Amino acid sequence: MPRQIPLEKVRNIGIMAHIDAGKTTTTERILYYTGRVHRLGEVHDGAATMDWMEQEKERGITITSAATTCFWQPRYGLLKDVRHRVNIIDTPGHVDFTVEVERSLRVLDGAVAVFCAVGGVEPQSETVWRQANKYKVPRIGYVNKMDRVGADFFNVVEMIKERLKANPVPIQIPIGQGEMFAGFIDLIRMKGIIYDKEDGTTYQEVEIPHDLENQAKTWRVNMLEAVSDIDDSLLEKYLNGEEITEEEVRRTLRVATLKTEIIPVLCGSSFKNKGVQFMLDAVVEYLPSPIDVGAVTGHSPRDEDEKIARQPDDSAPFAGLAFKITSDPYVGKLTFFRVYSGVLKSGSYVLNSITGKKERIGRLLQMHANHREDLDEVFAGDIAAAVGLKDTKTGDTLCDESKSIVLEKMVFPEPVIQIAIEPKTKADSDKLGMSLAKLAEEDPTFKVSMNEDTNQTLIAGMGELHLEIIVDRLKREFKVDANVGKPQVSYKETIRKKVEAEGKFVRQSGGKGQFGLVNIIVEPSEKDKGFEFVNEIKGGSIPKEYIPAVSQGIQEAMRNGIVAGYPMIDVKVTLFDGKYHEVDSSEMAFKIAGSIGFKEGARKAGAVLLEPIMAVEVITPEEYMGDVMGDLSGRRGHIEGMHQRAGAQVIKAKVPLSAMFGYSTELRSMTQGRANYSMEFHDYSEVPASIANEIVEKSSGKVTA
């Protein structure tokens, strides 16, 4: 079946924001107005379509980014009445699920940033914004919850400018705020939109109310100045006092949004059904199609320096990126992927250029939150799910075997918190390992390991909520009952100096012996670079078939560092010389030699202990400022700044995670429940010597590592 919708009429977008800004409700309304859902789902009664995991329905938060497809014809503007296809990914706002946001932003072309009209720019908004900046994702802003008491559209616009360092340009301003919110003024057409009923499908176009005429003129001038700054010919017209047409405004707004120079800002109340259709018009009008985004670049699987580009074109060779794996009770493993170029047919074979394996596409599915529709083929720009890919992981490239390419991989943060987990019964014991492996396959920030000293299974993740949800899923989806220990900090180790080391493994005791000798340089790598292995063997002092074994031995040794047995990170090892024996050398011998050499090098290189540091933001009434700051300092916190927000004081600090367990209870009692806080992982930093000694002592008899 040929392509149904031309590529320039496709929009791949994400709905992004902090927790409670109304993302899921906004997505629900989009699905309702585009005809994909016949009944409105409300988050607060647990019926939202996009929140389809049991835990999401109970907690009213979105955990996994569900992908869905819908169609929209704008009512106004240059694309009036032209049918567009909109693929939407609903992303979670809770900081423990940042990886889901990161994953979805990687495969999107544009995004709607939803802000709460009362709370404005919250800490998580800043995190998500930084992630979107990293991938240069064009955005429009949507100030939601305009019907709430305390709603202030203009304050939110100011916060977007100040805190996100963006260039917000309102293209609408509200008519009334809070309970008086009735609609908005369209600054491009200079018309008022007043909603009649609660269902939002009925509204009247009116002249601008008298009392808002001056305000509307002021903000229209602001918009015209912003677009004139982008286009010299418009600037000339503007300075000469000539009329700038509606078409020119819309066209320039689109160009500026695509370059991320402007963020068009709209307003509404998704819950009260006001403003969503006009936001959809803006999605189609200002956010990019895959053609606007242009070619995706990657490199040859054989040579990282050989760059390859793939145009968003059905006639180009197939290239796609797997961005999410989920387990489905009916079809098994589902691999969500974005098609960047070419066409993929159901039943065909693709090459996974990361593993080098060919895989067969059993079925292709178009997902609508949690129900699905079978497809015969998918085209450039599509987001779909495949059944049948056994060895594909998140971030892998799928491509045409004859024209292979490796797209940029996704980098995921290291887990910061871990707990010991043990099955309650023998039956649970049999299922636990398999169930955890499935969950780890779905979520790259969830890690499972074994403490060899105590024989305990350890699970690690991005926060307490993250691990709570995992344990909950074990019980519900996999029917595994487990006991969990207290949360433990995931410490890491690294080195501070550059040293040379030798690793020698010799075993000669009759018959075939074992021999391997390696000379390596061990040094710190750049922060967040992970492990780097450089092979500089010249002249065959170690045969090339043994080199991967050396790297493997080093990586295995890094799993248990030498300070307190914690994993080592940010280390670079260069293999520059060695010796082998014609008869006695083997892969195993060189693997052990690599491990011995690395351990010796790490000892000489001044190995140190690292701990996760959290960026903490506390919002408190002024009278508790002193107590809160004193308490944070007592937790080894470093206060970085304070400012006012909506009548409260905001304190920003960097605090070790180990000092933050149980903080919410302490904060409640200190402020009589009037303060709240949020925190997210910032980085790993060296543990002070006195505390490091305590940790080492504990770990020498440790129960959980």
UniProtKB/Swiss-Prot annotation:
- Primary location recorded for the protein, binned into one broad class: cytoplasm
Which domain of life, per UniProt? Bacteria
Among the GO biological process terms of this entry, one is:
ribosome disassembly
| PROSITE patterns assigned | G_TR_1, G_TR_2
Nucleus found in the keyword field: no
Keywords attached to this Swiss-Prot or TrEMBL record, sorted alphabetically, are: Cytoplasm, Elongation factor, GTP-binding, Nucleotide-binding, Protein biosynthesis
Q: Where in the cell is it found?
A: Cytoplasm
Q: tr-type G domain: from which residue to which, for each copy?
A: 8-291
InterPro entries of this UniProt entry?
EFG_II, EFG_III, EFG_III/V, EFG_IV, EFG_V, EFG_V-like, EFTu-like_2, G_TR_CS
Residues holding GTP = 17-24, 90-94, 144-147
| Record-level GO cellular component terms | cytoplasm
Entry GO MF terms: GTP binding; GTPase activity; translation elongation factor activity
Q: What's the stated role of this polypeptide?
A: Catalyzes the GTP-dependent ribosomal translocation step during translation elongation. During this step, the ribosome changes from the pre-translocational (PRE) to the post-translocational (POST) state as the newly formed A-site-bound peptidyl-tRNA and P-site-bound deacylated tRNA move to the P and E sites, respectively. Catalyzes the coordinated movement of the two tRNA molecules, the mRNA and conformational changes in the ribosome.
Family named by the database record: Belongs to the TRAFAC class translation factor GTPase superfamily. Classic translation factor GTPase family. EF-G/EF-2 subfamily.
HAMAP family given for it? EF_G_EF_2_B (MF_00054_B)
Q: What is this protein called?
A: Elongation factor G
User: The organism's lineage?
Assistant: Bacteria, Pseudomonadati, Chlorobiota, Chlorobiia, Chlorobiales
Gene encoding this chain?
A: fusA
